[in-house]
């Protein structure tokens, strides 16, 4: 039997891009291609790129260059594939003219066509080697579930719609089938992602779909309830990311707080507020009522006291005054957000914010970002310290002789904190990766927790 053709794969960018990579790799394996872990062991290389900010663009271009140097046969996909250069031609083709093919994001079919053109598929594909859940690039016990592609918003700092297009929601039955297959494969935590999770179904007018004979609207609240019911059957978690602060978010909070889904639909919201001053938010083309946001955050916590809120912000946006920045700091103190990230504003090629007046010097932008993070870390440290002495449910991510590393319901992988768990002293308390364990919290710093089983 002849050796199967081998494809190398480099995946860059956000969790949405990671899901695209998983779909491409799943299709490659379904058609009988092997995935090579090295450049020299591959017949060609696929590079999935990111093009959101300048640093990501450069990282992607460097990765393409490295793949060309080490292998020579490279197909490029992802957000950077849709980006144009100053001359109007494709940026990748201009910088790296030797690439075999370039596609935009979420383009499994186009990538496979390019692979077929340069590396014909085997005659006897090993379809049985591909699990129903597909090939995943995350650890076995958690996975990302992408429910839609694209975005209908036109935030002035963002170019995602120009690369990924307008919102396209996946059929609800398709999403539920993937979720079920993932749970059956041993996944203990599903991280629901998209460009705008709250907008799920807007493009199809919340059309009713069917799953196992039951009607489910193509709508965030209905989908979350269905996922929560499914997760409860498998003793698993569902975590929501990229939740735009629409009024409909209020409907999801009770699912986290009470009833059959409590403990399965996690009391966790990733809501990118971006700023708090109405004038800055208007220039960003974001919802501009910060006082109402504060009221909603307080109401959410009244309904669900255990709620963790993660958010991201931009400091030093064009035209931001010192007073407007102080308003942002006041918001962080009052809202008491649990997990916060902040970026010093950086111009992104193609973003309409580049045309706004009042661009701030680099040192001012960075100084404001640093001040923001000082305040945010003080708030986070206070909230985390309240967990000392409590017993929390922890999902174990890593195990070594020194103990385990896991996460609570308040911590998403890669971006939030962790719990350092003491080694189990009794056989009855031993744990492995993917286990849920009860941990008594004995210590905390500004970001992480320590505890014992």
From Swiss-Prot:
NCBIfam families: 30S ribosomal protein S12 methylthiotransferase RimO (TIGR01125), MiaB/RimO family radical SAM methylthiotransferase (TIGR00089)
HAMAP family: MTTase_RimO (MF_01865)
Sequence ranges assigned to domain MTTase N-terminal in this UniProt record: 5-120
Top EC group: transferase
Pfam families cross-referenced by the UniProt entry: Radical_SAM (PF04055), TRAM_2 (PF18693), UPF0004 (PF00919)
Function in brief: Catalyzes the methylthiolation of an aspartic acid residue of ribosomal protein uS12.
Enzyme Commission code: 2.8.4.4
Top-level taxon: Bacteria
Species this chain originates from: Burkholderia multivorans (strain ATCC 17616 / 249)
Catalytic activity: L-aspartate(89)-[ribosomal protein uS12]-hydrogen + (sulfur carrier)-SH + AH2 + 2 S-adenosyl-L-methionine = 3-methylsulfanyl-L-aspartate(89)-[ribosomal protein uS12]-hydrogen + (sulfur carrier)-H + 5'-deoxyadenosine + L-methionine + A + S-adenosyl-L-homocysteine + 2 H(+)
UniProt cross-references to CDD domains, sorted A to Z: Radical_SAM
Cofactor (UniProt): [4Fe-4S] cluster
Domain TRAM: 385-453
Taxonomic placement: Bacteria, Pseudomonadati, Pseudomonadota, Betaproteobacteria, Burkholderiales
Residue spans crossing the bilayer: none
Annotated protein name in UniProt: Ribosomal protein uS12 methylthiotransferase RimO
Residues bound to [4Fe-4S] cluster 1: 14, 50, 79
Chief subcellular location: cytoplasm
Any GO molecular function: 4 iron, 4 sulfur cluster binding
Key words, A-Z: 4Fe-4S, Cytoplasm, Iron, Iron-sulfur, Metal-binding, S-adenosyl-L-methionine, Transferase
Domain Radical SAM core: 137-382
Chain positions recorded as [4Fe-4S] cluster 2 binding sites: 151, 155, 158
GO cellular component, one term: cytosol
PROSITE patterns per the UniProt record, alphabetical: MTTASE_N, MTTASE_RADICAL, RADICAL_SAM, TRAM
Cofactor annotation remark: Binds 2 [4Fe-4S] clusters. One cluster is coordinated with 3 cysteines and an exchangeable S-adenosyl-L-methionine.
Annotated family: Belongs to the methylthiotransferase family. RimO subfamily.
InterPro entries in UniProt: Elp3/MiaA/NifB-like_rSAM (IPR006638), Methylthiotransferase (IPR005839), Methylthiotransferase_CS (IPR020612), Methylthiotransferase_N (IPR013848), Methylthiotransferase_N_sf (IPR038135), NA-bd_OB-fold (IPR012340), Ribosomal_uS12_MeSTrfase_RimO (IPR005840), rSAM (IPR007197)
Biological-process GO terms, alphabetical: tRNA modification
